[in-house]
Design a protein with these regions (language model features):
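Conserved PLP-enzyme active-site core in the AAT-like
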Residues: 1-184
Length: 184
């Protein structure tokens, strides 16, 4: 989804440590295929001093029109803040799309699945991803992840994960389908 020169903006502060190397925040990942290695820029907006979403800062930054993706980390990760609620996610998505309709809103939904009646894509998020090991896999599934959302964006992700032309038509299951369904 992100290409060289694009800007990814985290609106829930700096993401948890395990994703630093994916983004390229962790300088030890330099040269290993991070987003930064491919010329994607990363910015973030801190939460307020009360650990709330800074909607004014989001509107101001996204309103400049150069943000390709707004990133929401739903889980608190290793911090002491609260998890981001579906209502907060909806407000971020609505605000983002009102000031910049083409900006992609993406939610890292790890640990957020099945915790509320709606999921991020039900409230305006364009793309969501998470682990099949945690909530959906019931700690039974030994591996796996998912990507859901707008068809064109899911297709782009599938082509990046596998190979252009094949996309989501192929992929490893490692004989784990039974465990995955047991977890669900």
């Amino acid at each position: 989804v992100l290409r060289p020169g694009d800007i990814m903006l985290s609106v829930t502060g700096v993401p948890y440590d395990t994703i630093h190397s994916v983004i390229g925040i962790d300088k030890s990942s330099k040269g290993h295929g991070s987003l930064a290695d491919f010329g994607v820029k990363f910015e973030y907006i801190e939460l307020t001093e009360n650990d709330e979403i800074d909607y004014d800062a989001i509107e101001k930054r996204v309103g400049r029109g150069d943000i390709k993706m707004v990133y929401i980390q739903r889980s608190r990760g290793y911090s002491l803040r609260h998890s981001i609620s579906i209502d907060e996610i909806e407000k971020i998505a609505t605000l983002t799309h009102s000031v910049s309709p083409d900006t992609v809103v993406m939610t890292d939904n790890c640990y957020g699945e099945f915790t509320e009646k709606k999921e991020p894509c039900d409230v305006g998020v364009d793309l969501a991803a998470g682990s099949l090991i945690k909530n959906p896999g019931g700690a039974i599934a030994p591996c796996g992840g998912y990507i859901v959302g707008r068809h064109d964006l899911v297709e782009d992700c599938a082509y990046r994960m596998t190979t252009p032309g094949l996309g989501r038509e192929v992929g490893a299951t490692l004989g784990t389908t039974r465990s995955l369904y047991m977890g669900l």
